[in-house]
Amino acid sequence: MLVLNNFERIKIGLASPDQIRAWSHGEVKKPETINYRTLKPERDGLFCERIFGPTKDWECHCGKYKRVRYKGVVCDRCGVEVTRSKVRRERLGHIELAAPVSHIWYFKGIPSRMGLLLDMSPRSLEKVLYFVSYIVIDPGETPLLKKQLLTETEYREAREKYGNAFKAGMGAEAIKELLAEIDLDELSAELKAEIKESTGQRRIRALRRLEVVESFRKSGNRPEWMILDVIPVIPPELRPMVQLDGGRFATSDLNDLYRRVINRNNRLKRLLELGAPDIIVRNEKRMLQEAVDALIDNGRRGRPVTGPGNRPLKSLSDMLKGKQGRFRQNLLGKRVDYSGRSVIVVGPELKLHQCGLPKEMALELFKPFVMKKLVADGIAHNIKSAKRMVERVKPEVWDVLEEVIKEHPVLLNRAPTLHRLGIQAFEPVLVEGRAIQIHPLVCTAYNADFDGDQMAVHVPLSAEAQAEARLLMLSSHNILNPKDGKPVVVPTQDMVIGSYYLTVEKPGAKGEGKKFAHPEEVIMAYEEGVIELHTKIKVRYPIRGEIVELETTPGRIIFNEVIPEELRFINHLVDKKALGKIVTESYRKLGYEKTGYLLDGLKKLGFHYATKAGLTIGIVDITVPKEKQEILEEADRMVADIEVKYRRGLITEDERYQRVVDIWNAATEKVTKKLVETLEASQFNHVYMMAKSGARGNIQQIRQLAGMRGLMADPSGRIIDLPIKANFREGLTVLEYFISTHGARKGLADTALRTADSGYLTRRLVDVCQDVIVREEDCGTEDGIYVTDVKDGTDVIEKLEDRILGRVAAEDVVHPETGELLVAKNQEITEEIAEKIVSANIKKVKIRSVLTCRTRHGVCTRCYGRNLATNSIVDIGEAVGIIAAQSIGEPGTQLTMRTFHTGGVAGEDITQGLPRVEELFEARRPKGQAIITEIDGVVEVRDNKGRREIEVINQETGERKVYPITYQARIKVQTGDKVYAGDELTEGPINPHDLIKVKGIEGAQLYLLQEVQKVYRMQGVEINDKHIEVVIRQMLRKVKIEDSGDTDLLPGSLVDIFEFEDENAKVIAKGGKPATAKRVLLGITKASLATDSFLSAASFQETTRVLTEAAIKGKVDPLLGLKENVIIGKLIPAGTGMARYRNIMVQAKNEE
């Protein structure tokens, strides 16, 4: 495969004036743009054809040379080269400045790079640059100091006193001289010495200066290049000027900004030629400096330059920044052709891998293919007549379209694409009408419904793209959800209720207890009306070659007809969970092809019997339990009792509130329990059937319909202690209705906020993980992590079995009693092995983990284990980072925003839901954090003169630590308890940074993992550990240098672990002293910005800051991640984009 942009890495640096002149195709001398009469570009202006190239292909400005044959000729009259007009997108010009100006990025950024190099404060630097003060460049023999600032009067006095014995100046010229004088090597040596000697603020300042000096020294950039003598002018097509229909012109803001620079520059030139007084020239230079500032980064200093309507003009920096900037708008996401969108409707008769494509849409999308085929089949004589045929929609076109579309998959996508299942490939089937038809089973993956949702269609063009769509993206291949390995294509709603209805038993139905010799007899008896669908019968049934006698129902026999032979016989009530199990089982045993058939069978059967059952609900189905009244009266009595106690002052307001809430909660529970009993008695209650089968609705909703609504929360989230006693069947009173609107309104507001927060979290996660790719088979590490059940108090949140399944054992696991080898080291733990380990009562297993993987720039297959979407060990090249980010981000919207107010208990907020996940991943210091012990030992809790404290005493070493505790804090331990370093003494979240100090890296990793899991599990969302591990690994990949030893590393800087080890290895090999460092935990935003790739960081956040730093350091981007490669338009280095697939040619069979 020919790759045009086949380069290894990309470097950024400062441009020297000579470099800028070398890029340029000519100097822009005039501020004019185009001639208002001829509408042709003015010569030497911002759109000049002589500099930037012709506006029309192969045609010079004056029209002397027209046609391709003059290619490359430079016209002797107008000086325009005859060439393609698209060179106007790539040719730069330049402006020669009459006075140097500073580049605002380097003077104004934080920290000010210019200021650090010159050891001046940004304030004094600003005074010099904007012509407020003079600066002494060379004091000569005078008592003045170098870099001393002088006001106008002080300067005059000094001139009178010392004459020309000293040299001072103002503006960028003076700064340029100072910068040019700097000897970087000498300065670097001085600073290193100072760092060794000094302490405190001075050392920190020296460190920061050394960082900048080293950057310049290593990158080969010269400090004086931060001052501009010449400014590049970007190509005119990138700052276009277009005529609007009213004859007016719309132009890019950059043209205005360039015009101001050119105007001021030309005026300054004229003033200098005339020899104008100093003060006027100075003012003009200041204005030129401000104009250049506005061009580079408008609004960074002072008031932004505004256009018409007081709108700040968009400068070069703004062109890159933010969602609308170049990076995110045009480089990371582009609009594509061969795409369309339309409303979706359900297509129940489609197969799992098909979608219905409207005819006119298909014709438009596959137009070139149809035209080629028309010519090839001899229906049209040439491409032009073929095009005419397609445009006039001749009848023969449709037959050709049918052929073209066969075996050519299309991609369907629904926004928002929260995970990779939001884009899948289908085989198109032509349909009448203008709506896309979707298979009902893929709706869950897309989160689609048919209330007006729209979907986009894309056509993969090349043979390679088609092959990938068919082999990797076909919907029937994406049955399992990558986040937890559970099937995502499971029958829902009608299909569930159909299967449920079909497999229900009805005691005492017609013909109960009859015996049959063969399943076909049963069906016949049912069709003849001898027995019902739900009758209990006995039958001899052939299963895998042997005859078994079963007690079952005709419905279940019909249900088993769609089940593959290997999985029969399913002889129980089938609800949604059971369907999920059947699909999982089928996928594991029979692969996706047969599972596809099974799913289509279940779909057809479910719809059919849901229709036959005719399940309806009416107000009659909602039966209010008889006991409700008694329960309520009882509760009212208890509440009245408490009110009396409260009025007598026997209990506090808080206690009263808490008890009332508890009473009503208990009452609601009782009503619900009675309601369920009532419903279960009548097994065929339709409302209950829907909830029980998992088709729609849940017990909470039925409780509100037929039980009581219970307690509601007010806008702040506090529970109102006045319950809603009525249900929707009886109807609410006005007050009850009013109270319940609070909750509803808050719910809507929350959902809106949550969606945005969740999207932003996903974006940060993707950014931090995007370069985690499976790079090799085995990294050879001996490390691993020990896993046990994850518990919250005594409740098991995540079982050991789930945690070890599909992982690779890091050591042999042996049965504690029999000594039998259950799993060998480096062997995958399958379902069977996991079951054995649990049944052997082993509580702790050491597994390979991403957290301890030694692969650089990625992970290895052994440490990652099984790819959950395919149920087999992960392939090399899989972008597991992106999968992890999507798996954590996608359920984000389901997490509640609510900061729960535990009704009145010490009134403290526990952060939960999405904000808690964010707090963990951003490694923030949590609110109300727990106090943890730093040593192992025994606890003593005591009150000491009005303050509480906990002392931990280590019996072996005799070490003691005392922790003062506030009275608000809730203590978790008692005197005499044994604690270990890192255990909590009070309740609350732990600060992960403290945990690293006490328990080391591993402790912090496991804490973060368990805490994130807790939040998701509380909401009933299952996410596999390995996804969270990938993110935590990325948060911990940097070390902070403490002592640089003999290496080039700077103390206090953040360095990648592997880079740090490399540097040390080099130094040790030479017999030098290695550097020391400590691991740091970075939040995901910080970690994204600290990545090695400046392209990735710049496209994430703080674009200008990242680019400023990268340019000064002369950073090289090794293009290892996905984003960097997307930005420069290369194939991503994952999956089939890896080097090893580069030269494989895909050939379509049917063409030859």
UniProtKB/Swiss-Prot annotation:
GO molecular function, one term: DNA binding
Pfam families per record: RNA_pol_Rpb1_1 (PF04997), RNA_pol_Rpb1_2 (PF00623), RNA_pol_Rpb1_3 (PF04983), RNA_pol_Rpb1_4 (PF05000), RNA_pol_Rpb1_5 (PF04998)
Binding site for Mg(2+): 449, 451, 453
Entry keywords, A to Z: DNA-directed RNA polymerase, Magnesium, Metal-binding, Nucleotidyltransferase, Transcription, Transferase, Zinc
One CC-aspect GO term: DNA-directed RNA polymerase complex
Residues the record lists as binding Zn(2+) 2: 779, 853, 860, 863
Cofactor binding note: Binds 1 Mg(2+) ion per subunit. Binds 2 Zn(2+) ions per subunit.
Cofactor names: Mg(2+); Zn(2+)
Coiled coil regions in record: none
Subunit (UniProt): The RNAP catalytic core consists of 2 alpha, 1 beta, 1 beta' and 1 omega subunit. When a sigma factor is associated with the core the holoenzyme is formed, which can initiate transcription.
Family stated for the protein in its record: Belongs to the RNA polymerase beta' chain family.
NCBIfam families for the chain: PRK14906.1 (NF011498), rpoC2_cyan (TIGR02388), rpoC_TIGR (TIGR02386)
Functional summary from the UniProt entry: DNA-dependent RNA polymerase catalyzes the transcription of DNA into RNA using the four ribonucleoside triphosphates as substrates.
Protein name: DNA-directed RNA polymerase subunit beta'
